[in-house]
Amino acid sequence: SPPVCGTELLEVGEECDCGSPTNCRNPCCDATTCKLHSWVECESGECCEQCRFIKAGNVCRPQRSECDIAESCTGQSADCPTDDIQRNGQPCLNNFGYCYNGMCPIMYHQCIALFGASATVSPDSCFDSNLDGQGLFYCRRERARIFPCAKEDVKCGRLFCNYFQSSCLYQYSGDIDFGMVDDGTKCAEGKVCNSN
């Protein structure tokens, strides 16, 4: 059967159906024909407003962090462009870190997440435990085998933090990655941790 215009049900052959002309609340739809008005560019989307594309340059997805990129409408589409991030390795947080997959992982923030707001990163000497490759102190794990850190990689194993008067503190749990320095964390100038 042919579509019946004005039922508020989108049927085959209709571009829109917003009900009767007196009840229609969709400015893009011609309620008498159930077709979109000829001037309509879009009906919905982050970059669509009053049936027209929002002009180019209007931000549709704000920057969430220093390693994220704000997206703006193109003026040619109702959709916000694909979410994009800064390239990996871009310096961030005043050169304390490098962007990694849209984040700026630094040890200081990881210590705060593990111990609380007063936590700081322990002195370099604490990280030497990662040279042992014993127990919880290592750089890499493959199944049951653990691999010690090389001297230049000691800051890519277990994370050591100071909390109030205590130093060389670390955390661990059943999750083997818990308490380890996060991948992408700056460990030296021009170098980041990578568990692979």
From Swiss-Prot:
Record-listed E.C. numbers: 3.4.24.-
Source organism superkingdom: Eukaryota
Cofactors, names only: Zn(2+)
Domain Disintegrin: 2-88
Primary location: secreted
Keyword Nucleotidyltransferase: no
GO CC terms in record: extracellular region; plasma membrane
Positions of disulphide bridges: 5-34, 16-29, 18-24, 28-51, 42-48, 47-73, 60-80, 67-99, 92-104, 111-161, 126-168, 139-149, 156-193
Post-translational modification as stated in the protein's UniProt record: Glycosylated.
Database matches in InterPro entries: ADAM_Cys-rich (IPR006586), Disintegrin_CS (IPR018358), Disintegrin_dom (IPR001762), Disintegrin_dom_sf (IPR036436)
GO biological process, one term: proteolysis
GO MF term list: metal ion binding; metallopeptidase activity; toxin activity
Record PROSITE patterns: DISINTEGRIN_1, DISINTEGRIN_2
Function, as annotated: The hemorrhagic metalloproteinase-disintegrin-like bothrojarin-1 is a potent inhibitor of collagen-induced platelet aggregation by blockage of alpha-2/beta-1 (ITGA2/ITGB1) integrin. It does not present any fibrinogen-clotting activity.
Family from the record: Belongs to the venom metalloproteinase (M12B) family. P-III subfamily. P-IIIa sub-subfamily.
Protein name, per record: Zinc metalloproteinase-disintegrin-like bothrojarin-3
Organism of derivation: Bothrops jararaca (Jararaca)
Lineage: Eukaryota, Metazoa, Chordata, Craniata, Vertebrata
